Amino acid sequence: MKILVTGATGYIGSHLCKLLTEKQHAVTGWDIGLYGEANNVDNFTENLYDIDVTNFDSKHKFDAVVHLAGRVAVDESVRIPYEYYKTNIEGTANCLDNIETDHFLFAGTAASWDLASPYALSKVAAEDIIKQKAKGYTIFRFFNVSGTNTIHKQLGNGTHLIRMVAKVAAGKKDTLQIFGNDWNTKDGTCVRDFIHVVDLANAIITAIEKGPTNSPYECLGTQNGYTVLEVVKEMEKVTGKKIPIEFIGRREGDIESSIVPEVSSLLNITKTLSDMCLDQYNLERNT
């Protein structure tokens, strides 16, 4: 199949492009060059273009479009909400206006249930536009994605929890800062549902090959919730390293708990939290 991946040089996009290419799909990647010379997909696709999804008007046609491009940091969205509305809403609308496809696949978020941040609001608005305009669609709601199959260099300032814990374990940071210890959870720290990036990418490929679901959303998570402190303990267990922690104030836009309500039938879970912790630690230790 002829497939476009927006956000192709990002964390999820680079893994997805590699797996799609291994399955003999013809992959085209778009991104805006945020990763500079260290292109994470230059070995996996012949067609990589520096295209801003908010600012193109040329017409294109693909069998499927996987729209991963977007702004994704909850705390940043509170500071610069307009940029999130522009990229995540206008960028999605522009893709729908200018790309002809029978199947539009969208990277939504678990944050969409609580609407506690401009990031979440922008993703829900994009979902609504897709339902109105796409010929056929599959809307995913991603939970907390982690792990690696070693192809992704993870440049930039990624701040997801498992990566930050792994940085401390690998000696790149002295202390892990935890946002709040007064949440209404078993140990006072936030609860999150983690999914391995390879499991998630394979679920996207399954969706591409099966065709549009046209359902409200497909949840990609494991239904296993872990507190921040439980993740710290798991990292200590698999690495044998002590993780010094520091509790600081709650982060604006955060929610107490995020666990998938129902796992999509598109997802085959093969990786555990231990796998994600060890993957991330090995990556941080060797880069």
Each model region followed by its residue ranges:
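N-terminal Rossmann-like NAD(P)+-binding domain of SDR-like oxidoreductases, especially those catalyzing
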Residues: M1-S146
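Short aromatic-enriched loop/helix-cap "lid" or pocket-rim segments at secondary-structure transitions
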Residues: N39-D42, N149-Q154, C190-V191, V231, ...
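Short-chain dehydrogenase/reductase
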Residues: Y85, I89, A116-V124, Q154-R163, ...
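Basic phosphate/pyrophosphate-binding loop/patch that engages nucleotide-derived ligands
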Residues: Q132, L161-K167
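C-terminal substrate-binding subdomain of Rossmann-fold SDR/epimerase-dehydratase oxidoreductases
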Residues: K167-T287
